[in-house]
């Protein structure tokens, strides 16, 4: 035990980014025809766990593209290999397709389970679209 004390200064632990940083991720089955994909550009305040940024949904259907602000929080599992649990929410204006007339605010929610490099799995939902257990990849 006494031998360990002298080595404390030379031991290192892997620590994620500190302070304020930018991260970009893609959520979804990229390459699957017609699958909705969410691109996220997020500013992370590591000390507080607050996250905010822009989400962009792309889907190869009429009215399938949306760009809007999101915000949320990051939680740490603290168990074994520490994972980041990211909760995001936002709203965007959705215009109903013709022949209907009108627009309304649509809710968006996302939940991601990522490692310190921001790779993992997650899901999101908006309107009548619910996507679970898709890849999350840092870009």
Predicted regions and their residues:
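Surface patches in mature domains of proteins
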Residues: 64-77
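Generic short beta-strand segments
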Residues: 22-28, 54-58, 88-94
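Beta-strand-dominated lipid-handling architectures at cellular/organellar boundaries
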Residues: 50-52, 71, 85-87
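A generic structural micro-feature
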Residues: 34, 62-66, 102
